[in-house]
Amino acid sequence: MIAAPFDAVADSTGKKPFYSHLYVQVLAAIAAGILLGHFYPELGAQLKPLGDAFIKLVKMIIAPVIFLTVATGIAGMSDLKKVGRVAGKAMLYFLTFSTLALVIGMVVANVVQPGAGMNIDPASLDPTAVATYASKAHEQSIVGFLTNIIPTTIVGAFADGDILQVLFFSVLFGIALAMVGEKGEQVVNFLNALTAPVFKLVAILMKAAPIGAFGAMAFTIGKYGIGSIANLAMLIGTFYLTSLLFVLVVLGAVARYNGFSILALLRYIKEELLLVLGTSSSEAALPGLMNKMEKAGCKRSVVGLVIPTGYSFNLDGTNIYMTLAALFIAQATGINLSWGDQILLLLVAMLSSKGAAGITGAGFITLAATLSVVPSVPVAGMALILGIDRFMSECRALTNLVGNAVATIVVARWENELDTAQLARALGGQAEESAPAGLQPAE
């Protein structure tokens, strides 16, 4: 159910009761969804519209949030060269860790070999089961992806909710505002004033998060069943463990080097993580993540550039999944890939993960795009993991979210746009207790 406004409900110490916290409500909704989907699968399978409706509500507000954050952030920059530096450093970070994620997935697949011993005849696989994904994969290309960043019309970019197109226009508009100087002050003031109702709307929409998480989880368990995990438990377990180690070890080392704790960051964004877990959509947490990163001391200009771009270029979880799943299919079908074949797979995955970014079902479609170029592994082999992809998509989205949170703090620190004292307070829990739910307009 929709969370009530608990602001007025507090105990004698002035603290809110535990059940008033969004993460508690979402966690309870996820548990309820699992139980309903398991014991009443037919009813659970019919609750998909609840999750879809919530995700659509959030997507409705993503474009205004990105526009206001980026445009006002860049307009307030005294040095426009910073825009290029921030973007360049962000892309360097994305390329480094996205490639590392691909390599880690490949190494783990070779060591654990989750598909070994299955001995599946490739000729027995039904290619029609993945035909839709394969056709979408063939439609993607690097050139097409890059040209598609430029919107045909401004209205079209906002109407379609295309994150990169909205970001592209917002950056140009913010630069134009900064260049006109005093003439643009009234526009900047108007946009800053407009942030209040828009970001208050974000807080209101988040009240519906438990409903969305409940419906999405009930549908997932009701339609696919917990039992469907058992047959491919080795692959699922390997992927979840690899992603967990990537977050705690790799991103943990990056966090430690940059002066903060990955565990403290995970606690800080726990509401966004649970939201992603319940809905299997990282986009559902985008407004909240931008909110949290700005409250954690990252300048708005950095937050507005890094996070939306990272949602297309910094997909650590998706990249781990791509190489791990590709080698699983090869192992399950008895195909022995040489190191040359695997290096080719890695290079193709580096490109296809960018060409298919930002599209619906990106993880599975990107895998199809990669396998269609690598002749050694049959695309039809994707039918083996089609039934469990929904369970793996949650882990992909969670890892992607954490990766973008870490990237934002790191890039902000590189650019000296990070308030380290504010970051320490936020990760220590002080900012979370005092700050409202919506992203705060610039002062």
UniProtKB/Swiss-Prot annotation:
Gene (UniProt): dctA
Gene Ontology biological process terms, A to Z: L-aspartate transmembrane transport
Segments traversing the membrane: 17-37, 57-77, 92-112, 139-159, 161-181, 201-221, 234-254, 320-340, 368-388
Entry's Gene Ontology molecular function annotations: fumarate transmembrane transporter activity; malate:proton symporter activity; succinate transmembrane transporter activity
The entry's keywords: Cell inner membrane, Cell membrane, Membrane, Symport, Transmembrane, Transmembrane helix, Transport
Protein function: Responsible for the transport of dicarboxylates such as succinate, fumarate, and malate from the periplasm across the membrane.
Intracellular or extracellular location(s): Cell inner membrane
Descriptive protein name: C4-dicarboxylate transport protein
Keyword Magnesium included in the entry's annotation: no
Similarity-based family: Belongs to the dicarboxylate/amino acid:cation symporter (DAACS) (TC 2.A.23) family.
Membrane topology: Multi-pass membrane protein
